[in-house]
Amino acid sequence: EFVFDEHPKPQEIEIFLEGHPQNNLLQHTCWSQVKENWAMKQVVVRRGGTIRAYAMILIRSLPLGLKLFYIPHGPIVNYQDEALIRFFFTKLKKLARRSHAVTIRFDPNLIDRTYPYAKRNEERGDHQQGNVIQLLSTLKCKHKGYTLYLKEATQPRFQAVMLQENMSWEALNAKTRRSIRHAEKCGVMIHEGEDQLNHFAEVMKLTEHRKKI
């Protein structure tokens, strides 16, 4: 039996995210701190006490006491589990109505297709997430389509990924290597790992203010 929990503990959310293949920065609490003009609410679905689904909802106030719900790169859930999806989205819609939210916008962190950058202009087969879109459409969710324009998507649809095993100095192009050397000469220090992500989030926030984003 599924249970919808609107007051999960932060520690258990972090544990759930760390072990989930859809884990991403935009569903962590630190991202809500960057989006300081939005309120935030975290919800989970449990089965047998174990978290099975999670969403960090960013909430924006609109005129007339209305709200906008946005779940960036989420919810984090097994989209192949139809019973779980139906339960979760039913509860999310009830929460939205109770909060006077006029819409729930979300963009799941699912990989539709992968291909080498050099083959980006070649024809490819069918989209891999068609069954997920079909399931969500039965819950009255509207797919915005596979737009190629950034202005028509809340988050970029395309992500350039370099596998860790391929991240060698030799794999970088000459321009990138020159840029790194120039940055090092200017005193920029490069650190790898996750221990300073909170500081990175603060830098993003300062950039947001400076650029008036």
State the predicted function of each range.
Residues 2-8, 129-213:
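Acyltransferase donor/substrate-recognition loop-hinge adjacent to the catalytic core
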Residues 5-48:
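N-terminal charged segments
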Residues 11-24, 51-60, 139-155:
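An N-terminal domain-start capping segment
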Residues 32-121:
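Conserved donor-binding loop and adjoining core beta-sheet/short helix segment
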Residues 84-88, 128, 213:
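Soluble or luminal CAZymes and related metallo-dependent hydrolases
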Residues 84-85, 124-125, 172:
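Charged, low-complexity surface patches
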Residues 119-133:
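A charged helix-plus-loop insertion that forms the helical arch/lid used to bind
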